[in-house]
Amino acid sequence: MEENQTNRQFIRLLEKHAVTESLFELVFERPEGWDFEPGQFARLGVEIPGEAEPQFRAYSIASSPSENDLRFLVKVITGGLVSPKLAALEPGQGVVLEGRAEGNLLPARIPGGSTMWYFATGAGLAPFLSIMKHNAETKCEEREEILVVGARTVKEVEGLVELARRHSPTCRVFGAATREEHELQGRLPLLLETGRLEEHAGRKISKEDSRVMLCGNPECIKAVRAHFKARGIVSPRFGAPGQLLVESLW
């Protein structure tokens, strides 16, 4: 790793795996002493022709703090500046890692309850991979963990579900497809509104017994958050306790 006075480090790609046609799992070397908490994100930058400075984007960390590498999920955005270049990297090539880990998508912020629900779309699965793997390693989470992933096609759903189960064999995982026939079909907000999701999982989501974390497509996450707000499940704010944490990304 190379470091300079601007607190930027060059990190090399070690592995690349295709999760779906447009979602890639990238594994980079981890700088010594670069610490993070499960649920946080890092800023990755790539060189852009004609630009004096690298272009940076925030990506949630998918590895657990105990691992010696940094793992990310990158969804390729058509016309995007950064994601296509990240997805095109090959082992040995690298990116710029800027600063320290950041973010407040931390389970400890919403204590209590008996069930922890994770809702993710696409690359929004990344922070939950980190959290679930850390929990499996440390046995620090006593609440039941349920992960719900949403994607367009059955193939995409299967890729996300397989990745999640590989990181946490004990977590209950459910996948929902929006554009193809599936045992759980429809957008996450609709599946919540109709009660189909809770019926399928065999669990009710309540303010008293449940804690909820959301990460993924901003439009979907906004709708899911509004649904939970109507049920009294809200984020902690100004010292008031809450049951919900949210992070939107593409």
Go through each PLM region and give its residues.
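A common structural junction motif
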Residues: V46, R231-P236
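FNR/FR-type flavoprotein reductase catalytic core
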Residues: N4-Q5, L81-R231, G239-G242, V246-W250
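Ferredoxin-reductase
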Residues: E2-P91
